[in-house]
């Protein structure tokens, strides 16, 4: 692959669902330096816990905005089991195993899961919903004002709590 090839990013359910819920997977697709990769655990979690997002998820897969993989190698299963013993959820275990075993960045918001991932590989690159929104603003995919409206919607309707900043303007450099 050439230097312009996008970087695969293992993406957890919560990060993806944040964009699915507002109908803005186009923001992820517009971040052309990344290719968002989800595990089959994401499909299970979207189907089981976010059924209203299932059609948007399936469209994102068909459109190539996200790519699905199955974690079934011995290395994946070993890391999964080790993390499961720490009482992480199946999804978190899968995302972390996928990122660690493939040397890929991980887009995940869960604080405890992020700590476990970095404990296993301190150089693991972590992304999150807020950082992806900042990159989308910097790429001209939306304005700060539009991002702030989305932030309020997430905080009000979607268990997204990022009170450490009032506006994305504070995060733009």
Named regions from a protein language model:
Residues 2-98, 102-104, 111-116, 120, ...:
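Active-site-proximal, substrate-binding regions of enzyme catalytic domains
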Residues 125-142:
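Long, charge-dense
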């Amino acid at each position: 692959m050439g230097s312009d090839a996008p970087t695969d990013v293992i993406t957890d359910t919560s990060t993806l669902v944040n964009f699915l819920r507002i109908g803005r997977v186009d923001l992820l697709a517009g971040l052309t330096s990344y290719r968002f990769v989800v595990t089959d655990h994401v499909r299970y979690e979207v189907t089981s816990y976010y059924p209203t997002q299932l059609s948007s998820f399936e469209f994102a897969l068909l459109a190539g905005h996200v790519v699905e993989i199955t974690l079934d190698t011995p290395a994946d299963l070993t890391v999964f089991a080790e993390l499961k013993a720490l009482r992480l959820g199946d999804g978190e275990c899968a995302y972390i195993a996928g990122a660690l075993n493939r040397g890929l960045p991980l887009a995940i918001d869960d604080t405890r899961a992020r700590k476990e991932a970095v404990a296993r590989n301190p150089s693991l690159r972590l992304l999150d919903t807020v950082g992806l929104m900042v990159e989308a603003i910097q790429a001209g995919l939306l304005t700060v004002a539009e991002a702030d409206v989305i932030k309020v919607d997430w905080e009000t309707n979607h268990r997204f709590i990022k009170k450490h900043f009032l506006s994305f303007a504070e995060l733009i450099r």
